[in-house]
From Swiss-Prot:
Residues carrying sugar: 316, 373
Name used for this protein in its record: Transmembrane protein 132C
Presence of the UniProt keyword Membrane in the record: yes
One GO CC term on file: membrane
Family classification: Belongs to the TMEM132 family.
Gene responsible for this protein: TMEM132C
Principal location class: membrane
Region named Disordered: 820-857, 1022-1072
Basic and acidic residues biased stretches: 820-836
Membrane topology: Single-pass type I membrane protein
Length: 1108
């Protein structure tokens, strides 16, 4: 019997059905993606087309990994998606992709490079040239209203004298309000530079005009700003820049003198300030001690000029007498010493010559009080000393003057030296020229110095330029970031730097002129990141490899018999894994709290394995080894770490723990992908404009007779990991291909054990190639071949061109396929594979390429959408039959598939071009289905509970009604013989007792449910009772133990209660019901109806129900 409060009956079959549905959906989702039961090893990367990428014609380039990159980006054996970044190149780089005998190349389009080259088309000028502008003086005075701008080409090889082609002209514009002044120059010389001059109008130095209704701006201490711009344009036939010096007052408006064509290409240079005040002569200070200070002109002087040195004393000094000595070399004449305040100071000069030097001694004595009340300056002038530059040995040099002060009875001060710059030229400024604006510090990784050449030039008043690199002095402001050579001819990093920096400064000085060189230094972020496809390596059951001297003698498997252990010198193979080293290049921002800046962005990591390959090692080489710095091979059980060592110190730049387990795994699947050619497509990356995404797709269809194709193979192990077979040594295995239909494809003698070759013979399709993977010949048993794994490859041979490729190509059309195996070139073609039952085996290459790129970038997705419109075919589903799925290995290459699978028999013809809708993937559909089923189950459960609670509340006896209940016994007779009812005879039952007979026949369960769920009104009482006596008696006793009593009830009140309990082995649900009735409705003491007449009893009960 059921207890009260149990779950309602209908929930049990509903929950069971929901459980079955959930299990079926889960099974379908897992089966659809080809995932094995052992999926705990998610560290292994999903399979992809294992092509080799190379970037050609680039000096520095890197392959990239996006942070939190979706593993499903590369999840198809037919395609591989990689992003790369070209840091430095002199010409457009070329991407090369190869696999087996096939290779394909594609030049990176210029619009994907996004270079800031404003020199014009790159077919005339070098690819990496950039134009740099320097404003020589950012302060322009009315006495010298000239602006000079030096331009030079960055990235140009200064030693390449053959690059003397006709360089373009530059036109410079200065704008102030609505007025404009222009000038021009032409790039030339080995350094590729020129100086443009602009003569500003005198009216520009007046205060700016104020329009009506506007307030007059405050005087700007930095001067009136003037914006400078430039444009690039070719010269005329003679190579001249005609009209470069033309000035016009209001030519800024477009449509005047062709300015409409140039203003759209204006490039900003910077801002200069205009000042009306005169440019006073600049003096440099030389402090001898706390009292005496010498002031000398800082500008260079010419031969024959007189230089005046001003000797001053501090205003608060109490010195009354001092002796000043000045010593000069020959070539400088000491003329005179005189004072401007003869009443304040007495001056007496003596000149003495001694060999190569001339010494002047000047005695200065105070005669009167200092004029404190007449001047507020910090220094008072004492004497002026005049020197004449008589001669000099070079065009540019310095003349030193040695100074010393002596105080009577106090001694002398230290010697101080000042320099007078001698030059026959009027220099405006110096400019350090660099090949680039930034430097990549890879010396930290390789130990090789990275240097950048430097040139320093001077510019004169007449815009003449001279190389003064050998005469300058230089110093780095922070040698922990960047260093400069002693000869100041290059800056460099040698790997001992500890940080990078934005706009690191190296100062260059020539005479009194100085100029900074700002360079951004990028350094790798430490520690480096080591990425291993599988950090736990196990032995592979059945794969025995020969033992050589550099391999450990692996312990034999305990499961192998004695025949396998005889002296063959073989041991079990360990799993292999791929290894690569990643990092980010960072640079500190300007200021003390500068945030780090990233090359590209924080979301990108650079593959630097090729840079640190020589410095990678394993701490325990006997546990595992590295092959070519990219393949990890287990040797024996243990734990070790992969380390990247610093080439310059004993420090460790990165490490990764590797475990070689004692467990054994087996090869569960051998995935086969036909490769008849390769095609490559390049797309811009939406995350960063400097990165380029490449998609290489394998061609599956053989289209010409005798065309050859190879196979790409992946191994799947019982631990869930997958690995390309290419990383294993070809000496340890061999692949043998067998054709299932020689009329379609044949298998010639393979040229390489890694790539079996198939040849097209006739049209056909299906799983026509069987590939057997066997262990090395030296480890084969004598009686039988040791086949490690078997794979079945799908082949499609269709002669003729693909109609889907007849549409014209776009900017990012796939490159041509270079089939070196068959010495052909084909356009990238899309195809389908159909099984023998007419169902589709694989999606088209475009659709699978879309699946691989689905999460790559937004821009790539949009481009692929356009490509589907042109080239997609409506025959790309994988709906193979059951029999075929049993013979084909699980296709985990589409784990999980991103493509939409068209239904078979959709009515689309083979060659129809349609726009394929891009819906949800199988994984997404499965997850949404699970979510919907769960929500439905919860909703049904809540509704069922609410329904049961509502019915229970309506049928429960009120508390006040219990007082009117009778003491009479209510009986429920449970028997298994129909004769028990008739044996009661005609004797009526006691007035206070009632017996209800429940039939347990085959149909009674359903009928009892119907009766109880309809409020307890009995429509049928069957006379056949099929039930065991033990069960009925037990249940009868149980209900006798729990009668309902009420001392206040009347004798005629009858309570009718029915309990029914279903044994566990019965198929009927358990139902509980409570029925209450008044004595006016039911009278159980019946004088006119015999108890033994069930038909009459049923009729009587029906009458009572009708009356109610």
């Amino acid at each position: 019997m059921r207890s009260e409060g149990a779950a309602p009956g209908p929930a049990a079959p509903l929950c069971g059905a929901l459980s079955l549905l959930l299990g079926a959906l889960l099974g379908k989702v897992i089966e659809g993606h080809g995932v094995t039961d052992n999926i705990q090893r998610f560290s292994s990367l999903p399979p992809y087309l294992p092509v080799s990428y190379h970037i050609l014609r680039a000096e520095t380039s890197f392959f990239l990994k996006e942070a939190n990159q979706d593993l499903l980006r590369n999840s198809s054996l037919q395609a591989r998606v990689e992003s790369f970044f070209t840091y430095k190149t002199r010409q457009p780089p070329v991407l090369n992709a190869s696999y087996g005998p096939f290779s394909v190349e594609k030049v990176v389009p210029l619009d994907l490079m996004l270079t800031s080259n404003f020199l014009g088309p790159t077919n005339k000028f070098s690819f990496d040239w950039k134009l740099k502008a320097h404003i020589l003086r950012d302060k322009v005075y009315l006495s010298r209203p000239k602006v000079q701008v030096l331009f030079h080409i960055m990235g140009r090889d200064w030693d390449d004298h053959g690059a003397g082609e006709k360089l373009p002209c530059l036109r410079v514009f200065a704008f102030r309000e609505t007025r404009e002044v222009r000038g021009s120059c032409r790039l030339k010389g080995d350094l590729g530079l020129c100086v443009a001059e602009l003569e500003l109008l005198s009216s520009w130095f007046s205060a700016p005009t104020v329009g009506a209704g506007r307030k007059k701006s405050m005087d700007q201490p930095e001067g009136t700003p003037v914006e400078l711009y430039y444009t690039v344009h070719p010269g005329n036939e003679r190579g001249d820049c005609a009209g470069g010096d033309f000035r016009k007052g209001n030519a800024i408006r477009p449509g005047k003198d062709g300015l409409e064509e140039t203003t759209s290409h204006l490039q900003r240079i910077g801002t200069v300030g205009l000042y009306r005040a005169q440019d006073s002569a600049q003096l440099s200070e030389l402090r001898l001690d706390g009292n005496v200070v010498i002031w000398l002109p800082s500008r260079p002087v010419k031969q024959g000029e007189v230089v005046t040195a001003y000797v001053t004393i501090s205003s608060n000094s109490s010195v009354d007498l001092f002796i000043l000595r000045a010593k000069v070399k020959k070539g400088v004449n000491i003329l005179s010493a005189q004072t401007r305040e003869p009443r304040q100071w007495g001056v007496k000069q003596e000149v003495g010559s001694g060999g190569k030097h001339v010494t002047a001694t000047v005695a200065c004595q105070r005669l009167g009080p200092s004029p404190r009340n007449r001047s507020s300056s910090l220094f008072n002038e004492v004497v002026q000393m005049n020197f004449e530059i008589a001669s000099f040995s070079s065009l540019s040099g310095t003349q030193p003057i040695t100074w010393q002060v002596e105080y009577p009875r106090k001694g002398t001060t230290d010697i101080a030296v000042s320099e007078i710059f001698v030059s026959q030229k009027d220099l405006v400024g110096i400019v350090p020229l660099a090949m680039d604006t930034e430097i990549l510090n890879t010396a930290v990784l390789t130990g090789k110095t990275v240097a950048m050449p430097i040139k320093v030039v001077s510019v004169e008043e007449n815009s003449a330029v001279m190389d003064i690199s050998e005469s300058v002095e230089c110093k780095s402001t922070d040698e922990d970031v960047i260093k400069v050579s002693e000869r100041c001819d290059y800056i460099f990093v040698n790997g001992k730097e500890i940080k990078g920096k934005m706009d690191a400064v190296v100062n260059f000085t020539y005479q009194y002129l100085s100029a900074p060189l700002c360079v951004t230094v990028w350094v790798p972020r430490l520690p480096l990141q080591i990425e291993v496809s599988d950090t736990e390596l196990s032995q592979i059951k059945g794969w025995r490899v020969p033992i050589v001297t550099n391999k450990r003698p692996t312990r034999e498997s305990e499961d192998e018999d004695e025949e396998e252990r005889r002296g063959r010198g073989c041991a079990l193979q360990y799993q292999h894994a791929t290894v690569r080293v990643l990092t980010q290049f960072v640079s500190e921002g300007a200021g003390p709290w500068g945030q780090p800046n990233y090359l590209l962005s924080p979301n990108w990591q650079f593959d630097i394995t090729h840079l640190v390959a020589d410095f990678m090692k394993l701490e325990e080489p006997h546990v595992a080894t590295l092959q070519d710095s990219r393949v990890l091979v287990g040797r024996e059980v243990g734990m070790t770490t992969i380390q990247v060592l610093s080439p310059l110190s004993d420090s460790i730049l990165a490490e990764k723990t590797i475990t070689v387990l004692d467990d054994k795994v087996s090869v569960t699947d051998l995935a086969i992908q036909l490769v008849a050619g390769l095609s490559v497509a390049l797309y811009p990356n939406a995350e960063n404009s400097k990165a380029v995404t490449a998609v290489v797709t394998a061609e599956e269809v053989l289209r010409t007779p005798k065309q050859e194709a190879v196979f790409s193979t992946w191994l799947q192990f019982s631990d869930g990991s997958v690995t390309p077979l290419d990383i294993y040594d070809t000496k340890d295995f061999s692949l043998a291909a067998t054709s299932q239909d020689e009329a379609v494809v044949s298998v010639p003698q393979p040229r390489s054990p890694r790539w079996p070759v198939v040849v097209a013979e006739g049209e056909g399709q299906g799983p026509l190639i069987r590939v057997d993977m066997t262990i090395a010949e030296a480890c084969q048993k004598s009686k039988r071949k040791s086949i490690l794994a078997v794979g079945v490859g799908n082949v499609r041979v269709k002669f003729g061109q693909n109609d889907a490729d007849s549409s014209p190509g776009g900017d990012y059309e796939e490159d041509e396929i270079k089939n070196h195996a068959s010495d052909r070139r084909q356009k990238g073609q899309h195809h389908e594979r159909t099984g023998q039952d007419g169902h589709l085996y694989g999606s088209s290459p475009v659709e699978r390429e879309e699946g691989a790129l689905r999460r790559a970038t937004t821009t790539a997705r949009s481009l692929l959408d356009n490509k589907v419109v042109k080239n997609s075919r409506a025959d790309g589903g994988r709906l193979a039959g059951e029999g075929q799925l049993q013979n084909i290995p699980i296709d985990f290459t589409n784990f999980p598939a991103h493509v939409d699978l068209p239904k078979a028999g959709s009515g689309l013809e083979e060659n129809d071009l349609v726009q394929t809708p891009r819906g949800l993937s199988d994984l997404e559909i499965g997850m949404y289905a699970l979510l919907g089923v769960f929500c439905l189950a919860i909703l049904v459960f809540l509704i069922n509970c609410a329904t049961f609670a509502l019915k229970y509340r309506h049928k429960q006896v009120p508390l006040e009604g219990q007082a009117s209940m009778t003491h009479s016994h209510d009986w429920v007779w449970l028997g298994n013989e129909a004769e028990l009812l008739e044996s009661m005879g005609d004797a009526p039952p006691p007035q206070d007792e009632h017996t209800t007979i429940i039939d347990r026949g085959p149909g009674a369960c359903e009928e009892s449910n119907h009766l109880l769920l309809n409020g307890g009104s009995h429509k049928h009482v069957q006379s056949q009772i099929h039930r065991s006596a033990d069960s009925g008696g037990r249940q009868g006793r149980e209900q006798k133990q729990d009668p309902l009593h009420s001392p206040t009830s009347k004798r005629k009140k009858v309570k009718f209660t029915t309990f029914t309990t279903i044994p566990p082995d019965d198929s009927c649900p358990t139902v509980n019901s409570i029925v209450s009735s008044n004595d006016e409705d039911i009278k159980w003491v019946c004088q006119d109806v015999a108890v033994g007449a069930p038909k009459e009893l049923r009729n009587y009960l029906e009458k009572l129900k009708d009356k109610a």
